[in-house]
């Protein structure tokens, strides 16, 4: 009888331990933050970037807060930090068609494909947050690859390589 009681006690303890796993809170107000993937793929419309779904935490209308959160980097292991450490938001202005984002000069340390990917990530993120059709990106007090700014929209954010796909499948 004692052995049965001890066995039941052990089962109860194990069951309670298994039930104590911390559940991730349900996302109430999701926002998509786009980052570079750790494993590059060209099999979908995002290519080398992908969205990480995050909680707006009651700040869904506070673009400065959301972009500061975004620039702090991804939470998931399947995404890479897209921006140099120290990159912060300086200003953001939204017009009917375009959002202008100015970040600290750390961003100007990017060039070539890394700058293109980072700008694509910011563009996709900001266009979803603001519902504007293009994004102008500036680095405070410096140039980006020899230009004052980079302007992107959905047409020049295409990172999909569909050259190996059968045209009949499209």
Go through the PLM ranges and name each one:
Residues 4-9, 15, 19-170:
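Bimodal "functional hotspot" detector
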